[in-house]
Design a protein with these regions (language model features):
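Local cysteine-cluster metal-coordination motifs and their immediate loop/turn environment
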Residues: 125, 203, 225-254
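Short microdomains enriched in Cys/His and/or Lys/Arg
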Residues: 251-264
Length: 264
């Protein structure tokens, strides 16, 4: 059953909004109440001003919440009109959002070492988890994938968080290993040293990571991306097909037990 929505309306002000990789931006907003309640793996649903015909909010995972500073940092890719307008919001710009949305990562209590697998703009919620694991003294290794070197984000963050091993793969070989990140991830899972796997990125990547985790009897969670209209369970536009029926990503996700997901 979905948990009751914990989302509330929050006004925010842009602190900074800058490009950190090709087509990928870091947005830092001031939203003190939100910053104190977000948990790793949750998301926010942002109203982007500038187009009266655009009625839907933009659902985005977050990277870091600083309760002391009252700020939230969100990484996003410019992929359409809404995110293009979001990228044009400068310091001092204001709007509102709904959050925190959904529920976050659920790391098993007996996990001693985790494997984190992130691809493309799926890095932020995984990096957020990495920093949380570090605070909890849980060891972790990381596999990061991107289309090319110009689109890689998060490597320094994973290293700073204390990752044991960091493997980078790019489709074109312009940075790290050439190929798909699922290959080294599957090999690492075969070593039998992980108690948990978390993955976010392209659907096919998460599907293959989930398959490798199942083959090695390792509990795996995935953070799924879906278009949303409301973000609090009323519209049924973000449904995920699972073995237990259709589940809304906004309420039952965005993180799911990978073994129960039918369509990633």
């Amino acid at each position: 059953m979905p948990t009751p929505s914990s989302a509330h309306m929050h006004d925010f002000e842009v602190v900074s909004n800058k490009e950190i990789a090709q087509g990928i931006f870091s947005l830092v907003i001031s939203a003190p109440k939100l910053a104190s309640t977000l948990k790793p793996g949750q998301f926010v649903n942002i109203a982007v001003p500038g187009d009266a015909s655009s009625l839907l909010r933009v659902p985005l995972s977050y990277y870091r919440a600083d309760a002391e500073a009252g700020t939230v940092e969100i990484w996003y890719a410019v992929v359409g009109d809404d995110t293009r307008r979001l990228s044009q919001m400068g310091p001092g710009s204001t709007s509102d959002l709904l959050g925190p949305g959904g529920h976050g990562w659920n790391v098993p209590a007996d996990c001693n070492r985790a494997l984190l697998v992130a691809g493309g703009i799926g890095v932020p919620p995984v990096l957020c988890l990495a920093e949380d694991l570090s605070r909890r003294c849980i060891a972790f290794d990381v596999c990061v994938g991107a289309a090319c070197g110009d689109k890689v984000v998060g490597l320094d963050g994973f290293k700073a968080a204390g990752a044991g091993e960091v493997v980078l793969c790019t489709d074109d070989g312009s940075a790290g290993q050439k190929g798909f990140v699922t290959d080294p991830a599957a090999k690492m899972l075969g070593l039998g040293k992980y108690g948990y796997v978390a993955s976010c990125g392209p659907a096919i990547m998460m599907q293959k990571v989930a398959q490798a985790a199942a083959e090695n009897d390792v509990y795996c969670e995935v953070s799924l991306e879906r278009m949303m209209s409301c973000g609090f369970g009323a519209c049924n536009t973000c449904n995920v097909e699972t073995v237990d029926g259709m589940k809304g990503a906004c309420m039952c996700g965005p993180t799911f037990d990978a073994s129960k997901v039918v369509v990633f």
